[in-house]
């Protein structure tokens, strides 16, 4: 019986890993028709940001420039100009459709992520006993490691996360999260997060080392500083 109770966190851990993926797929499919119908009915412009508006205007300017360029190169008969205008009109309609699809994508992904976060939060609260057992496993595993391996692991993680070569990885990760929420790519925001987030993590890590590790395992701090030098 105790052995069976000790193994119960394993299915719980597996469910935590796969539950976000399942929630994302199921809610995306179930919410998509409702969000599409709501957007097409309301035609709200609340979610229009400056970057999307700039992209739409750039496309319209390109279409206008193409039309003017074709008229300057040679004189079109009336029928050809009419065909050209029809083509530009079709391209404009396609641009509006793409604009609406982008907004639907933003609303759908943002709603799905909020729902996923709420469900996982409730799931974690309900599975508090399993989390306690998992925490005891992790603590026991870390306790059995030598100070050298612990210090090496801390150095490896810090170099990967906040080392001099980590900005590109942070840029990819933050860009992926940004895209997953359905927001348009924004180099300024991503660059700002990349330049500040690792610094915050580095400060938290240093505080943790000096405040927590110095109290719990002074020998580990000595080994860490020796390896870091």
Swiss-Prot record:
**Which segments does the entry list as coiled coil?**
none
Q: Does the keyword Membrane apply?
A: yes
Question: Where is this chain's protein located in or outside the cell?
Answer: Plastid, Chloroplast inner membrane
Q: Name one GO biological process term.
A: potassium ion transport
The record ties this protein, via InterPro entries, to:
CemA (IPR004282)
Q: Which GO terms describe its molecular function?
A: antiporter activity; proton transmembrane transporter activity
| UniProt entry keywords in alphabetical sequence | Antiport, Chloroplast, Hydrogen ion transport, Ion transport, Membrane, Plastid, Plastid inner membrane, Potassium, Potassium transport, Transmembrane, Transmembrane helix, Transport
Q: Which Pfam families match?
A: CemA
Q: Which GO terms describe its cellular component?
A: chloroplast inner membrane
Topology term for the membrane: Multi-pass membrane protein
Q: Which reaction does it catalyse?
A: K(+)(in) + H(+)(out) = K(+)(out) + H(+)(in)
Q: Briefly, what is this protein's role?
A: Contributes to K(+)/H(+) antiport activity by supporting proton efflux to control proton extrusion and homeostasis in chloroplasts in a light-dependent manner to modulate photosynthesis. Prevents excessive induction of non-photochemical quenching (NPQ) under continuous-light conditions. Indirectly promotes efficient inorganic carbon uptake into chloroplasts.
Q: Tell me what this protein is called.
A: Potassium/proton antiporter CemA
* GN (gene name): cemA
